[in-house]
């Protein structure tokens, strides 16, 4: 429905939101079961079900991104609404986003260092985070986990500039101003992640899986 031109624009956006919410629920409820069956049994049908689900989800995610990027965002721009999505934040917004960062966001950010050797990992379930790769003045690298407080703050912020209304993700505002959270360090990488935890998964396994995805190992 979100990809149909005949559907009103606002309704198409709502359909994308519903899909995203349903996918979260599927990952919390169904995927752990499929993963467990794939791991614990030798039944080829169970293995096929898990892999089929992964392929279908990847296909749907690709289509989600295509519809949003190629259909929804251009239509919004025609109405002078610029939704910042997978692009650099315009520098002209930095002053306004900075006010929001210091007045609303900074106080509820709680960076936590990830101790890879000790497998210390305190991420909460079903929460958004930014994994920040830092390098100190001696060139030593470390990883910090920064919460994206969408449970207490709006997920989107609106700004006016040059006759356009900009729609900006909360996480993009945080990313733009991370230098104030880590003033003595060089930021070499920022990755958005969402933790959807299977109760049976050990935390050290979860940490290993996340780091492998980030570093491509």
Regions found by a protein language model. Name each.
Residues 1-217:
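N-terminal non-catalytic structural scaffold regions of very large proteins
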């Amino acid at each position: 429905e979100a990809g149909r031109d005949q559907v009103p624009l606002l309704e198409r956006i709502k359909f994308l939101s519903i899909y995203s919410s349903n996918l979260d629920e599927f990952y919390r409820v169904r995927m752990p079961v499929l993963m467990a069956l794939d791991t614990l049994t030798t039944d080829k049908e169970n293995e096929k079900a898990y892999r089929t689900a992964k392929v279908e989800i990847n296909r749907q995610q690709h289509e989600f991104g295509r519809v949003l990027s190629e259909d929804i965002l251009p239509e919004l721009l025609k109405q002078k609404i610029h939704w910042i999505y997978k692009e650099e934040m315009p520098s002209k917004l930095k002053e306004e986003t900075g006010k929001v960062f210091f007045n609303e966001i900074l106080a509820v950010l709680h960076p936590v260092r990830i101790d890879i050797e000790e497998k210390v990992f305190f991420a909460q379930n079903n929460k958004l985070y930014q994994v920040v790769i830092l390098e100190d003045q001696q060139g030593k690298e470390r990883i910090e986990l920064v919460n994206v407080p969408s449970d207490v703050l709006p997920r989107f912020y609106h700004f006016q500039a040059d006759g356009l209304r900009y729609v900006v993700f909360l996480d993009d505002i945080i990313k733009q101003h991370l230098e104030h959270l880590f003033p003595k360090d060089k930021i070499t990488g920022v990755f958005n992640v969402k933790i959807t935890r299977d109760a049976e998964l050990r935390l050290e396994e979860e940490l290993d899986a996340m780091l492998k995805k980030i570093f491509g190992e």
